[in-house]
């Protein structure tokens, strides 16, 4: 099964908590703090794997969560960092942020790696909080939470040459005759339901990658059939080989088909429409009258194309000429990165980690309630039964401006302040 788009949720690892510990050793009655730091959480890393050609793995696994860092230990032992989670993706995968649909990264190079989200920093142990005036801190810092993100993976095949044309014109036959690719071939429409890639390696020419794009039909640019899905795979190709069934045995008019396909390209992307094309009149062995080819060639040249190649993929007649022309043109067409404007790029906000603080007055009980993620983090860092730890606790409240805000709200001496399950009386 060929899967070229997937949505997944990712989350980096949480940092380990710093330890609260004191040196306990015989003959050392006043051993100081020796709590170690927590380890950093694991990162989420994307890596290109050329052995993968589809996003099928993401059809069954939708969540990727990196390992948390270990908590710090006694004797200044640092917690082990969480293992990074490496997610392998096919070359040509574009990563978008789901909500905005903006591009985070274009993974288009062999073995390319990209750190998608960093793990949370490990918290400091109480050894780091010791000062000449605070020699035995009974508090430590909890680890920072990991980052999370919902992303869309979109695969756009990387090929030098794209085979373009209506269904059943001979694209798969040409690919199978010139590469080791084995696309399904049969004499009916939509035999090919997924793109196929093959490497053209012929003596005397530089090898190149060719893609058989499933047959595009009229209205593809508006999403008729699987048009949009197929058209996007052509975007990365440098050269198009536009194949037309010149025999007309299926009741189609070759020139009309040629024009319609180009109209679909233009509707989808002007840049794609403007891409160099080699025009190929296939199934020439079934042609009953050479005038049909000559008329087609004349009309195509009137549109500005220099030449039409007469070919029969089934008998290999004219195939070598088309392949050599493709190789020649590729030498003159520079390799370009996928163009992504600033407006299309997802730029994450710089995270100076801040925690929400909410202060409300409970009129019924005349209590000031402080809540939010800041409270959760602060309470997890202190020992409320230790006087030194409580002094640190009140210092943080002052430094964060919470005490000033309480005074502005009209708090009075003896009023109760509650943080989760912890309460204290406010004293002027």
Curated annotation (Swiss-Prot):
Signal peptide: none annotated. GO terms for cellular component: cytoplasm. GO terms for molecular function: GTP binding; GTPase activity; magnesium ion binding. The keyword Magnesium applies. Its cofactor is Mg(2+). Keywords: Cytoplasm, GTP-binding, Hydrolase, Magnesium, Metal-binding, Nucleotide-binding. Residues 1-158 form the Obg domain. Its EC number is 3.6.5.-. One of its GO terms (biological process) is ribosome biogenesis. InterPro entries: G_OBG, GTP-bd, GTP-bd_Obg/CgtA, GTP-bd_prot_GTP1/OBG_C_sf, GTP1-OBG_CS, GTP1_OBG_dom, GTP1_OBG_dom_sf, OBG_GTPase. GTP binds at residues 165-172, 190-194, 212-215, 282-285, 312-314. It comes from the Bacteria. Residues 345-428 form the OCT domain. It holds the Pfam family MMR_HSR1. Residues 159-331 form the OBG-type G domain. Mg(2+) binds at residues 172, 192. It is found in: Cytoplasm. Belongs to the TRAFAC class OBG-HflX-like GTPase superfamily. OBG GTPase family. An essential GTPase which binds GTP, GDP and possibly (p)ppGpp with moderate affinity, with high nucleotide exchange rates and a fairly low GTP hydrolysis rate. Plays a role in control of the cell cycle, stress response, ribosome biogenesis and in those bacteria that undergo differentiation, in morphogenesis control. Monomer. This is GTPase Obg.
């Amino acid at each position: 099964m060929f899967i070229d788009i997937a949505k997944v949720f990712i989350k980096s690892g949480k940092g380990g908590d710093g330890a609260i510990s004191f040196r306990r050793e015989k003959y050392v009655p006043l051993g100081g703090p020796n709590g170690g730091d927590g380890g950093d959480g694991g990162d989420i890393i994307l890596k290109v794997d050329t052995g993968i050609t589809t996003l099928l793995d993401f059809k069954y696994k939708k969540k990727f969560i990196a390992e948390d860092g270990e908590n710090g230990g006694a004797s200044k032992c640092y917690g082990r960092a969480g293992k990074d989670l490496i997610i392998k993706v096919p070359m040509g995968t574009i990563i978008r942020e789901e909500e905005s649909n903006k591009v985070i990264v274009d993974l288009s190079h062999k073995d390319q790696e990209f750190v998608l989200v960093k793990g949370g920093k490990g918290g400091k142990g109480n050894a780091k909080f010791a000062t000449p005036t605070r020699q035995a801190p009974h508090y430590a810092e909890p680890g920072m939470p990991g980052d999370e993100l919902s992303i869309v993976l979109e695969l756009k095949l990387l090929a030098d040459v794209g085979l373009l044309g209506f269904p059943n014109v001979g694209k798969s036959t040409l690919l199978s005759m010139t590469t080791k690719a084995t696309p399904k071939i049969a004499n009916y429409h939509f035999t090919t339901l997924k793109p196929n890639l093959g490497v053209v390696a012929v003596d005397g020419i530089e090898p190149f990658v060719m893609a058989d794009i499933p047959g595009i039909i009229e209205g593809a640019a508006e999403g008729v059939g699987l048009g949009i899905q197929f058209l996007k795979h052509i975007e990365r190709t440098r050269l198009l080989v536009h194949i037309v069934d010149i025999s007309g045995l299926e009741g189609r008019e070759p020139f009309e088909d040629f024009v319609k396909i180009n109209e679909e390209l233009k509707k989808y992307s002007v840049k794609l429409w403007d891409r160099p094309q080699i025009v190929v009149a296939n199934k020439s062995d079934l042609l009953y009258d050479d005038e049909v080819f000559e008329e087609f060639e004349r009309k195509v040249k009137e549109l500005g194309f220099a030449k039409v190649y007469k070919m029969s993929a089934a008998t290999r007649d004219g195939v070598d000429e088309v392949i050599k022309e493709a190789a020649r043109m590729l030498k003159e067409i520079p390799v370009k990165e996928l163009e992504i404007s600033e407006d299309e790029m997802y730029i994450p906000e710089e995270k100076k980690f801040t925690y929400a603080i909410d202060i409300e007055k409970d009129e019924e009980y005349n209590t000031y309630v402080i809540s939010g993620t800041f409270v959760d983090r602060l309470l997890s860092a202190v020992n409320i039964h230790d006087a030194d730890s409580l002094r640190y606790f009140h210092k943080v409240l002052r430094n964060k401006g919470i005490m000033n805000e309480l005074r502005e709200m009209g708090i009075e001496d003896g009023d109760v302040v509650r943080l989760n399950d912890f309460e204290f009386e406010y004293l002027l």
